[in-house]
Amino acid sequence: MKLNLRFPSYFLPVVAASAFLVSCATPNTYEVQRAALIQLVEEDERQNYIQKGSMGANAVMTAAKAETKTAEKTATSTKAASIELKKTDTDIKTTTTTENKSASGYKLDTLFGDYILWVVDHLSGLLFSPKTNNSTTTQKIQLITEDKMILDGGNLTVEKNHEHGHTHKNGETHEHDHDHHEGEEEVIVGRALSFANGLFLVVDLKEEKHEEKKEAKSEMSMNSKDMVMMTKTEMMSKEMKSEQKMEKKEEHEHPHKKLSLSTTAYKFGQSFNILEFTGAMHHKTAHNNETEFKNLGKKYGGMTEYTIVDFDFNPPKPTK
């Protein structure tokens, strides 16, 4: 898997809107908002994100390259040993190639965590483009001129058992009204950050269960003569395959969760309380009612929706 330094084209998918509900505001400190973003990632990986994320984009690339080199070195040794044991052992060569491909990949969960924390430390590098129906024209605008200048932030939550909508066969997704119930458990699904210039940046980080693709494999039947002629190397190879099948079965029973990231930004004529923003977003997405959200634009000097289209590693200095 090749990693490109222009991270956003891979890891900041352009999403028009995400399902956000009522937010809970927190103190106006950058450290608190950064810590809150960490809470979006999986519990068992959190410490790893904190340690590696603070090291920056170079650490991400270094780690990825190191893993790739290790995989290549292991592959070379394994391939050499396989050829020495039996040059015509197609079975082992195939196994080696498969192990190669899986070992060379950089963990996406870790990269998501690294990237989120790196971006929040370098917000001025984000380049935005106003959302339009014309996809051929892309403006790149720097809306955040200073790093770490977050005004406020709050969690975006949904009811644990609530689904925001469903997709029909024609591909259209419809939202449905629902009633709130007292004591209903809520889960955090995202984070909203506000800035002094009226910009609201929303990050939606969801967990998706990873389902392995079923692969059809044809195996040749063996008679007693084949068993006698089977080499020790071939026997070891078949034992390894049997163990791998058991591991895959366990992974299927306990599927690994992958992270899905989406970001959107809304620019108003002036800043206002983040609770008012998330409250309006709640009615827009959960209740399919955009009236309150549109009224924010009228109340605060207009509103423009932006998507994050790129990242500038050398952003221009703000003019005084």
Curated annotation (Swiss-Prot):
The keyword Kinase does not apply. Its main location: membrane. One of its GO terms (cellular component) is plasma membrane. Keywords: Cell membrane, Lipoprotein, Membrane, Palmitate, Signal. Residues 1-23 form the signal peptide. A lipid is attached at C24 (S-diacylglycerol cysteine). It comes from the Bacteria. Residues 160-181 are annotated as: Disordered. This is Uncharacterized lipoprotein MG149 homolog.
